[in-house]
Amino acid sequence: MSGTRAGGTADVGLIIAVKRLAAAKTRLGPVFSTRTRENVVLAMLVDTLTAAAPVSALRSITVITPDEAAAAAAAEFGAEILADPTPDGHGDPLNNAIAAAEHAIAGSFSNIVVLQGDLPALQTQELSEAIAAARHHQRSFVADRLGSGTAALCTFGTALNPQFGPDSSAQHRRSGAIELTGPWPGLRCDVDTPADLAAARRLGIGAATTRVVAHL
């Protein structure tokens, strides 16, 4: 399925990398069974895509994943689905997946945004504003709410050079990316831990995640 949408002013390709659901968000294990945790991860992806899809700057959405359920959910939004070629045991699987997606779409897009797929409180306007701010720089990023991680990495006319992983905010800053300083609380609230999920719920989470965590 093609992830390219019509729109004369849309000039950005969005990439979301999603790992296999069974291996994702293990730090949520203390509050969820394995099956529920997988459902939470999938629901957060759906809510992220629900917020991102209406952003007028986006010409395409590409989801790279080895997971069939995640791929099927993303396809419902018209996303281009790429099978993650990263082998098991790879030392840097997230950045490798992002680089593979960048290579796949770089021939069509010189402007690319990488977005985390675990942003259940994301608002469409936040992502629109962040992309507008990113246009003033060749390469920029949005830190997470704790200031240590990265919620989004944006490039306009240059390579992504993704540095996701531990202390990715500092890594992106050291690599020359400009930190974007807008408030955007939902964009900054990625969910890795029960505390992150509580913070997202205080902001207001999307319908898919709400259905899964309603019993908490």
Curated annotation (Swiss-Prot):
Annotated catalysed reactions: phosphoenolpyruvate + GTP + H(+) = enolpyruvoyl-2-diphospho-5'-guanosine + diphosphate
Keywords attached to this Swiss-Prot or TrEMBL record, sorted alphabetically, are: GTP-binding, Nucleotide-binding, Nucleotidyltransferase, Transferase
**Where do the annotations place phosphoenolpyruvate binding?**
150, 165, 168
According to the UniProt entry, what is the EC number of this protein? 2.7.7.105
The entry lists its GO molecular-function terms as: GTP binding; phospholactate guanylyltransferase activity
* Pfam families recorded: CofC (PF01983)
What GO terms in the biological process aspect are recorded for it? Answer: F420-0 metabolic process
Q: What does this protein do?
A: Guanylyltransferase that catalyzes the activation of phosphoenolpyruvate (PEP) as enolpyruvoyl-2-diphospho-5'-guanosine, via the condensation of PEP with GTP. It is involved in the biosynthesis of coenzyme F420, a hydride carrier cofactor.
Quote the NCBIfam families the UniProt record gives.
F420_cofC
What protein does this entry describe?
Answer: Phosphoenolpyruvate guanylyltransferase
Protein source organism: Mycobacterium leprae (strain TN)
Q: Tell me the classification of the organism that encodes this protein.
A: Bacteria, Bacillati, Actinomycetota, Actinomycetes, Mycobacteriales
Q: Which gene name belongs to this protein?
A: fbiD
